[in-house]
């Protein structure tokens, strides 16, 4: 195999315009075995450097991706070697902390996800004695995790100084921004394998454990907390309990180098009596709250009683529509069959997340808008109009768009 690759390198070096028409067959058992041996050698070297503590994580390359609000979200690109070691540390931390995390935590955990978190919130507001919601948002959570507090939390259960040394190395590894090195004095870089687990450990100690041991015990009535990464929502039976928690939450966050985003944090009245209470006070419709891309609101049951429901949040609805519209206009010159085939994959992905109980109306509204975008995109493929509306409908009979369905029941 080495001889063949050397011959390719020789041709590439000596030819003015080399062209290689037969390469795929070179990826055979011999080459893969050779690569495997090199990998084993690299792993052995990595293990040795970990043992003698000469291992040093590389600074994470930081890039920025746009957010829905127009701001930029920092994302870290970690080296392959560091990813391997981080994954090993992550597995060790999960073995320690997964049994200790509270059931109200859903982010970045095995066999838990957004739907389970949304379902738990719905169960509390529909079957519990919940009348008030505290919807809070932490300002730049991942960027402001305090390293010293993080290490103190870890030291409560981890007494191995070598593991603690390695985790601190990752926290202090620094970042590269446009080729310039920057220290990381606080925060955990998003993008690494270890970052979500460290974030969960921080939230466990700062928020969820505190809520269970202090807030719930001091509350006069029923209350709950559901947390997904840095998103969380709390509900209370009595307003006084909600006010106490909201005030204490600000101080609690400040103690651990965190701050609530005031413009996105609020206490609202939310329950089966909210509508009549607000009406008696001369106020408008009951307020709603968003959690993980869904809006929780009060509608009517089949018998006409107030009943909590869930729908796609307006912000996420419009953001996804914009993404679909841009994709359609970028791919409008493909054959209709190919466009619809790829579009259906994207639609089903959308339905799988937003296809929850009560949300079928918003799913159909989304499909209707996408269908309009598809019609307009396919009529901009040239100077002449490609389809009349009737012709477009006939085309969809041949290549139908995926229909919405409910994938997750909240009952």
Regions found by a protein language model. Name each.
Residues 49-63, 68, 100-105, 109-112, ...:
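Conserved polymerase palm-domain catalytic core
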Residues 86-87, 91-106:
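Electropositive, glycine- and tryptophan-enriched low-complexity nucleic-acid-binding patches
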Residues 370-373, 378, 382-411:
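Extended C-terminal regions of large enzymes
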Residues 172, 260-334:
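A conserved non-catalytic segment of reverse transcriptases
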Residues 224-228, 265-273, 342-346, 363-371, ...:
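A glycine-rich phosphate-binding loop feature that marks nucleotide/adenosyl-phosphate handling sites
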Residues 2-3, 15, 81-90, 122, ...:
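Duplex nucleic acid-engaging cores and interfaces of nucleic-acid transaction enzymes
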Residues 1-41:
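Non-catalytic, polymerase-adjacent accessory regions of viral genome-replication enzymes
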Residues 285, 326-386:
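Right-hand nucleic-acid polymerase module
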């Amino acid at each position: 195999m080495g001889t063949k690759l050397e011959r390719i390198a020789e041709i590439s070096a000596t030819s003015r315009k080399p062209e290689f028409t037969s390469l795929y067959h070179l990826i055979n058992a011999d080459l893969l075995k050779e690569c495997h041996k090199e990998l084993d050698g690299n792993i052995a070297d990595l293990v040795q450097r970990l043992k003698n503590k000469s291992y040093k994580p590389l600074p994470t390359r930081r890039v920025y991706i746009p957010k829905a609000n127009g701001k930029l979200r920092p994302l870290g690109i970690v080296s392959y070697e560091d990813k391997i070691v981080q994954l090993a540390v992550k597995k060790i931390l999960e073995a320690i902390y997964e049994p200790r995390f509270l059931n109200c935590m859903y982010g970045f955990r095995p066999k838990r996800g957004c739907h389970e978190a949304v379902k738990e919130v719905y169960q509390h507001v529909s079957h519990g004695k919940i009348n008030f919601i505290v919807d809070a948002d932490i300002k730049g959570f991942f960027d402001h995790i305090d390293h010293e507090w993080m290490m103190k939390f870890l030291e409560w259960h981890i007494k191995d100084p070598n593991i603690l040394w390695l985790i601190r190395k990752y926290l202090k590894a620094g970042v590269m921004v446009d080729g310039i090195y920057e220290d990381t004095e606080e925060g955990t870089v998003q993008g690494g394998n270890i970052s979500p687990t460290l974030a969960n450990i921080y939230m466990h100690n700062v928020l969820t454990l505190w809520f269970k041991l202090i807030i719930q015990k001091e509350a006069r009535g029923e209350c709950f907390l559901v947390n997904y990464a840095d998103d969380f929502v709390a509900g209370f039976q009595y307003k006084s309990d909600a006010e106490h928690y909201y005030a204490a939450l600000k101080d609690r966050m400040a103690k651990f180098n965190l701050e609530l985003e005031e413009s996105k944090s609020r206490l609202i009245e939310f329950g089966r009596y909210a509508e009549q209470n607000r009406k008696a006070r001369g106020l408008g419709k009951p307020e709603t709250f968003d959690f993980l891309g869904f809006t929780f609101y009060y509608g009517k049951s089949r018998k006409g009683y107030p009943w909590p429901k869930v729908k796609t949040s307006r912000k996420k609805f419009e953001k996804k529509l914009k993404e679909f519209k841009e994709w359609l206009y970028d791919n409008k010159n493909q054959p209709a069959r190919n466009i619809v085939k790829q579009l259906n994959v994207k639609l089903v992905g959308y339905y799988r997340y937003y296809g929850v109980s009560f949300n079928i109306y918003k799913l159909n509204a989304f499909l209707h808008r996408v269908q309009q975008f598809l019609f307009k995109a396919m009529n901009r493929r040239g100077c002449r109009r490609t389809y009349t509306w009737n012709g477009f409908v006939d085309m969809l009979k041949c290549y139908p768009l995926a229909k919405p369905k409910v994938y997750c029941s909240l009952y």
